[in-house]
Amino acid sequence: MPLFSIIIPVYNVQNYLSACVKSVVEQPGPRDWECILVDDGSTDQSGAMCDALAAELPGLKVIHRENGGLAAARNTGLKAATGDWLLFLDSDDAMAPGLLAQLRGALAAHPDCDWFIGTHLEWQPDGTLTPHDGLHLVPGPFASSDYAARLKALYTAGHWSVWKYCIRRSFLEQARVRFLPDCVWAEDWPFDLELLLHCDRLYFLDTVFTHYRVGRQGSLLTDAKNLPKRFRGLAAAQRRLARLSANGTADAAAYAAMQDAAADVFWPQARTAAVRDAAIRKACLPYIEQLRPLYPHGTEVRTRRDWRLFQWMMQTFGPKFTLWAASRR
């Protein structure tokens, strides 16, 4: 049984895939890992490249599936994983050199921990690597029975990005947490919110896990036409959070903390939708009207004057007028 299972969802990344896979294969140390490439119905040469790489390089497994989105592809990889520990990597990014060697040391030093969290570097279009300004990670263990405290620690360490996690597979199986297939954007955060209910000990490592490529055109993060998909994902995540509250998995305090975190995801997207073209605003509006009453505030909204003004306009004049007014600026 391998020590690590590295899950890489693949979709239309023919220009980046080889570099991503080789960043795993070229890790120094024993071949105590498996790398699972999940081709999510790519329409370019990515699927064929997966097969060619698996034929050429050791340790690779390839799964081809119909297109279902990043969350569904990660779930497919989880189902196939056999390693003791799980790592995730996006197919346009790269694993940091020497990561697995550093993780072997961390796992041996902290055998009682189920969830390790590291850092990343931003991979700029010109090839340079820069630290992410939003990271405020304090290395070391963090334990608390207070869900809100655990959530704050995770959020402060750089939000929720599974490609800088190392998670014990048996812990994840016992928690029975999976990615939400209907959440086609930012699928990490509902996964994290739910998994955090089952884990009262985190370990923050001052270790770079990933070189995260920024500014790639056509991604869900950079393409404006994907804004409606983001709101559909937010609505799906909200339904999941409501079920966790209804079935008692999340108590009242935990649910309130989840909603506060969800607000910090919702409000920036609502503000972004306000300044896009009319068709995008029209597609986003039903989701904004549905979700806005659930998120009266968020920490980001409370700390910036423009967010407070935008929130006041939404509450006073309603989404339609606010989106129209923002589009006229």
Give each language-model segment a name.
Residues 70, 91-202, 210-228:
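Donor-binding/catalytic cores of nucleotide-activated saccharide
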Residues 23, 39-49, 66:
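A conserved acidic beta->alpha catalytic loop
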Residues 13-26:
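Short, well-formed alpha-helical segments that are part of the catalytic scaffolds
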Residues 65-81:
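Glycine-rich, basic loop-to-helix element that forms the pyrophosphate-binding segment
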Residues 32-41, 61-66, 91:
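Short beta-strand/loop segment that forms part of the nucleotide-sugar
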Residues 274-329:
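Membrane-interface aromatic/basic loop that binds lipid-linked glycans or pyrophosphate carriers
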Residues 86:
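Short aromatic/hydrophobic "clamp" motif used to bind/position activated sugar donors
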Residues 207-216, 222-252, 268-269, 274-295:
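Catalytic core of nucleotide-sugar-dependent glycosyltransferases
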